[in-house]
Amino acid sequence: MSITSYIFWLFLIVSLLVYYVFPQKLQWVVLLVTSIFFFGLSCELYTGIYLLITIFATYVCANKMILETDQLKAKKWLIIGIVIDAGILIVLKYSNFGIENVNVLFSVFGLKKQISHISWLAPLGISYYTMQVIAYLVDVYGGVVKPEKNILKTALFIGYYPQLTSGPIAKFAEMKDQLYSGHKLEIDKIAYGCQRILW
């Protein structure tokens, strides 16, 4: 769903109306639900499995890291999280690039064997959210931020729909209050937000 399409703007307006109808303490839930709907409308539903794996792996690894008193064990969880999250991105986005290079090598050595391309469909915003979760895991490991204890809030941080379309890659420390704290309806801020989307 393009941010310049009528459907996106209709979706955004409905999302805003629902967001401000709900009590402030539940507004983050509205953001999560609208992000899930947006994801479902924008790409094949089965690609959501990759996003769910990223959410679960990031949540588990971040919270395991903080429990470890041994730095090496904490680093183990950091590495596991990065390998899983980056691995999904690499396989989905770059496996065909690797296959092409292998096929070129086969040709150079006179081999007729060719490996077929794989038809992967990557989730919306995979590059953005992968870089974001890696930065989050590094910040948790470095003690810059504490890990989010609520997996649904972690899901919102990773899958927040305005960021899935065009970024930016945001730090958890910068985003958590904006996502999880309630907000009062302020027309000037909504107008400013619309300007930022367009320009």
Please annotate each region the language model reported.
Residues 1-199:
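Membrane-embedded transmembrane alpha-helical bundles that form the catalytic cores
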